[in-house]
Amino acid sequence: MAEQQLGVLKALDVAKTQLYHFTAIVIAGMGFFTDAYDLFCVSLVTKLLGRIYYFNPESAKPGSLPPHVAAAVNGVALCGTLSGQLFFGWLGDKLGRKKVYGLTLVMMILCSVASGLSFGHEAKGVMTTLCFFRFWLGFGIGGDYPLSATIMSEYANKKTRGAFIAAVFAMQGVGILAGGFVALAVSSIFDKKFPAPTYAVNRALSTPPQVDYIWRIIVMFGALPAALTYYWRMKMPETARYTALVAKNIKQATADMSKVLQTDIELEERVEDDVKDPKQNYGLFSKEFLRRHGLHLLGTTSTWFLLDIAFYSQNLFQKDIFSAIGWIPKAATMNATHEVFRIARAQTLIALCSTVPGYWFTVAFIDTIGRFKIQLNGFFMMTVFMFAIAFPYNHWIKPENRIGFVVMYSLTFFFANFGPNATTFIVPAEIFPARLRSTCHGISAAAGKAGAIVGAFGFLYAAQSQDKAKVDAGYPPGIGVKNSLIMLGVLNFIGMLFTFLVPEPKGKSLEELSGEAEVSHDEK
């Protein structure tokens, strides 16, 4: 790729931060808002689903989802997301980022609404249709990962590229927060309109029939922000790097970016030979890719896999951890609406105090500190705080020490988000060639979701008490919350070691990082 071909890409690399950058952040970021909202809102309503559809009047405890149903409801969207990341990642390189970007959003809108309209009033029918639609919701969400990251990286200038991609990803924190606020608002409204006694006072009346609408409204709300951004996604031009380096149309790329940057970019004559240079046409499964990027791909996949085991197991099962330490009262002392409110309040406080600030610390410092140092430090601090919670676990569960537990637990989330949860999303969008960028990001993200599935399914069983008398209905004894947290700490430490396989992209152009600029040096 000679210097002439780089004209339009250089213009993007050195462009001052301007309106189109922020427009791209909002368009891609609102997709991530929806992604996070849809994936995490289910953790707010699983206990409510148990009360409604698995009520047993003979039991001293409210109904709860059977183990296989809980695992399916929590994990099916993650399975869909993994599939979507691989499929749309590949498709984004084959057809272009823009062509498939709108399709992912349409899937999210339709499946969010359909999830809330899950058919029937019997447990089997509702759970089956809910899981079906949440799988396809996850499939659409999965496509948003590689496409949003790739589009933002290819639009950004090299000076603030990390902050722009991080800002898109930071909308995940806002989505988690929004899920909490929506649940708080909806449960408060229903509590005032349809007051009910606690389960201990009246088992049947503690779950009035109207609460069936609570979880449906919460789940369906995720469609709204996605719908608001669809028009603007369709108006975005294809990225210049895809048009020039993959579609081989430098003229169109120059015209598109001249409009976006609102400046004239000169079109050089010697372009075709550079763009079509055979040295840059190696495939994903070639020896050349293995030589250049094999360790990089191992680094991005392994770190994302290990991070998501810890991150998703903690996020999806916050309610179980908070119940175990007594931060959420025993279920029998609440009615169905109160339980939703208390779980949402706990999750919202964690998001507000640690999750959201962690994301925006990454936005603020990633282009000064660098991706590598932030990720390494994040894994290290997560390990420290996880062990600090786990080893003296019996100390933290005492009533007088619960605030300390919440502080320590919050700090693990802060350093996850001011750390590997953000950087594992950013780096794969920067270090691979344009024609494989979306695919490699999709592979890396899918490895992360594989870790999330391990966390979602594994933690559900592992965190059960070792005492058979204390396990949840239908579960075998596990290793307990304490030992589960120790295991997560060990995984965080291993993630820190694999970070050394990932290069530092700070301040470099995408072509310099991917090796696509090497041809120009050979030709000069």
Curated annotation (Swiss-Prot):
It is a multi-pass membrane protein. One of its GO terms (biological process) is cellular response to phosphate starvation. GO terms for cellular component: plasma membrane. Induction: In roots by phosphate starvation. Repressed by auxin, cytokinins, and the Pi analog phosphite (Phi). It comes from the Eukaryota. It is found in: Cell membrane. The keyword NADP does not apply. One of its GO terms (molecular function) is symporter activity. Mostly expressed in roots, especially in trichoblasts and in emerging secondary roots and root hairs, but not in root tips. Also present in hydathodes, axillary buds and peripheral endosperm of germinating seeds. Residues 46-70, 121-131, 183-211, 314-348, 393-402, 463-484 are extracellular. InterPro entries: MFS_dom (IPR020846), MFS_sugar_transport-like (IPR005828), MFS_trans_sf (IPR036259), Phos_permease (IPR004738). Its main location: membrane. It holds the Pfam family Sugar_tr. The chain crosses the membrane at residues 25-45, 71-91, 100-120, 132-152, 162-182, 212-232, 293-313, 349-369, 372-392, 403-423, 442-462, 485-505. Inhibited by protonophores (e.g. 2,4-dinitrophenol and carbonylcyanide m-chlorophenylhydrazone), the plasma membrane H(+)-ATPase inhibitor diethylstilbestorol, and the phosphate analog arsenate. Residues 1-24, 92-99, 153-161, 233-292, 370-371, 424-441, 506-524 are cytoplasmic. Interacts with NLA. High-affinity transporter for external inorganic phosphate. Acts as a H(+):phosphate symporter in both low- and high-Pi conditions. Confers sensitivity to arsenate. Although related to the sugar transporter family, it does not transport sugars. Belongs to the major facilitator superfamily. Phosphate:H(+) symporter (TC 2.A.1.9) family. This is Inorganic phosphate transporter 1-1.
